[in-house]
């Protein structure tokens, strides 16, 4: 619930924590006086299914097929999925940007993703910083038309599980530190690393509780 609520909120979902919990527990939204976007409901439900998928596949090697499958689960049934130019479960067809930064062009995404995965999967011992660095590179490629942040954070969670590292949730309240860390990675890796370590401490508190 925490992972889904926070990851979707970072991307603009307006659902409350209670509404998110209600979808998880009953697969319905419940009564609400506030207007709720249908996509917020769909993407909350599909994000829960993505979490099921990363838990079931935690020990498997990261691959293009798996990453595309996560995107397919996340975006199926959304308004985006009905657009001709939006590729559900496949790489982007149109250029996009994140935070004013240009990302990899559509025609170069496949090659860039293959290289990123080959470099990452060749590591004998994966540490937390390797997972964070993969995330930074993934977000800079921005391989999908939309949903990159959520898929990227799901990948981090999965890879932490795979390598025996305490996973973490980037909560909505620390998103500005998270975004700064992504932007400043080349100059100062400590910003994002410290943000993730702080989030890890919060997750440890959940486990202890």
Predicted regions, residues:
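FIC/Doc superfamily catalytic core
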Residues: 1-209
